Amino acid sequence: MTAETDKEFFQRADEYIDVANQQATQVNRGKVSASMMFATARFNAWVSASGTESSEDLASVKAEALEYFISEYRKMLEENLDEYIEHFDKYMGPGSGASG
């Protein structure tokens, strides 16, 4: 993560992961993942809209917002996949708990 990450960043992320892990005990983890991605997209659309004054303003920054959120998600996913590749046995092996 970047130097701009505040000290509560990972705590907030862990709280969302805890909710997802709880939901994954009740329903397929793919469905939980899809719901989490939708919630993230919905919230980020609101974040983008809240920084504008009108529908036209939002439309004018749509491409920039998409580029930013897609780029950031890709970097975060790549970092996390690389971490899981490096520590696969530790994270996914017997006794690991194998949750997000």
Task: Name each model-derived stretch.
Residues 2-100:
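Solvent-exposed interaction surfaces and binding hotspots enriched for charged
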